[in-house]
Amino acid sequence: MDRPICPPKIAIIGAGIGGLALAIGLTRRNVDYTIYEAGSQFSAVGAGIALGPNSLRAMTLIDPRLMELYKGISRGNRSPEKAHIFADFMLAEPGFGINSGWEGAPVGSKDFTKSGAHRKDLLDIMTRLFPTENVRFGKRAVEVRQAGQKVVIQFADGEAVEVDAVIGCDGAKGATRRAVLTENYPDHVAARYSGRYVYRVVIPATEAQQALGAYADDGKMFLGPGHYFALYQMSGGRLNLVAGRQKNDEWTHDQWTQDVTREEMLADFKGCDPRLIELLGVSIPYISLWLETEIVIS
């Protein structure tokens, strides 16, 4: 008599966008799994997300319903003729380059429609497409190790679980990264500062238009030596602003975010167009400084 085939036990570590996208795909294909999430609930931390053509295609492949729900929360460029433009690339100098004889360059494709959403709104629609009872909250993985043909996950609360496969969606500081890289690439386990940090904020569309006028209607990238501003539409009548600074120095702080004064922030963009400085000004006190690393992990 043949033994019954037991379905594999699959663990997903992390309930962010990557982990939930995987859960949706596995659910659609009737594959059982458990998500282990360190937080006590789905996180609302984050700002805007602009999705490129590969991400949009992936949504449909994961589950066509995900794309349909995303269309309901996402927002694109306001100008119909710029629907397929990812961003107008302009200069951050006074006049946005027009005074220098360069009026910018649109970057996009007829096969791509620009869109963006708030991270929380995206997570909210994703949780509709899989059984949330598959998520165990308050489970911070501290170690992932191979044990013969199985994998053992050790959690901070003392519990250990044995599974057939682990898919890590727990980020640059996660236990999965250490498990994969420590033996052969120990120098690459810790995240390394790229020399760039960013300020990011969600701004009401009315305030962005007061500062920038029609320039706030569509996706923009304002570039300058050692700095840039990225601006795009997202859900809820808001815009996402990311202001980046490249200094190539050392990050000496313990945390990945750092409080700064208004004066310190504005000094980072001295010499830029006054409208961009005004836009930064209306964001106070909601703006935070975040470092950027050389690591991209689901």
Language-model features: where?
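Residues at the starts of beta-strands that form the adenosine-phosphate
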Residues: 9, 32, 238
